[in-house]
A protein has these predicted regions:
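Active-site region of the double-stranded beta-helix
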Residues: 45-48, 72-75, 86-95, 101-103
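Short, conserved beta-strand element in jelly-roll/cupin
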Residues: 75-91, 143-145, 151, 175-179
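Histidine-centered catalytic micro-motifs
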Residues: 67-74, 157, 161
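Short, charged/polar surface micro-motifs in flexible loops or helix N-caps
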Residues: 45, 59-62, 89-91, 104, ...
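Double-stranded beta-helix
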Residues: 92-157
Length: 215
């Protein structure tokens, strides 16, 4: 596979949204009715699929001020990111580490967290200081087998991944946000940057909504 993009945070994109179409097995998986129903219940609306990518993390370098440090994602107030494990992932494979919503809210209040380019990342020293102040913080390291699926609200839960390890990580990553996400224009059906709105999906009303196609 040809490397498309290195984000300078340890994640290399091997495939992006433009490499998938309505017949792709990966596309069919992330738009299947069962999965969309789960995400819809959490977001309280039919979500929009805004990204589908195949990620490769070599886990061989440290990148400062990157997704290797704790952070929240900014695309929406609530969102769901999916991570389908392509290979087995253990603690030496740069696994995703997550802090739950309640504890993440406490961290935000304690450090007056602001989601700007300079302050979005939170290093381990800051988290360690909070723990020493008896603030309850528990890191959940997500490991699993090939084929396992993780769904996470990365706008609400502090997280990091792709830290140094002895093995590489391959993940199919995808993202759902609400029609009113911060990165989507108010008239979201006319938002040209939605990656899948050009696809043909006649007679499938739910799929049209998920892709942002005008109904």
């Amino acid at each position: 596979l040809k490397k498309i993009k290195n984000t300078d945070d340890g994640i290399i994109t091997l495939k992006n949204s433009n490499d998938f179409n309505i017949l792709s097995p990966e596309f069919k998986f992330v738009t299947n009715k069962y999965l969309i129903e789960i995400v819809s219940r959490y977001l309280n609306c039919v979500p929009i699929l805004t990204n589908l990518s195949l990620w490769y993390s070599p886990n061989d370098k440290i990148f400062e001020n990157s997704s290797q440090e704790y952070h929240l994602d900014h695309e929406d107030y609530k969102q769901v990111k999916g991570f389908l494990f392509i290979n087995d992932i253990d603690e030496q494979t740069g696994p995703l580490s997550i802090i739950n919503t309640l504890q993440s809210n406490e961290i935000q209040k304690s450090i007056n967290y602001k989601m700007t380019k300079k302050t979005k990342r939170v290093n381990d020293e800051i988290i360690g200081d909070l723990i020493r102040k008896n603030i309850n913080i528990q890191e959940n390291v997500i490991t699993g087998k090939s084929g396992d699926l993780l769904l996470c609200d990365t706008s609400s839960c502090f997280h990091y991944g792709s830290r140094l390890g002895t093995k590489a990580r391959y993940i199919l990553a995808f993202q759902y946000i609400t029609p009113f996400g911060f990165t989507v224009d108010w008239n979201w059906r006319n938002y040209d940057k939605l990656p899948f709105k050009h696809l043909e999906c006649e007679n499938n009303l739910l799929l049209k909504k998920v892709l942002g196609i005008k109904i």
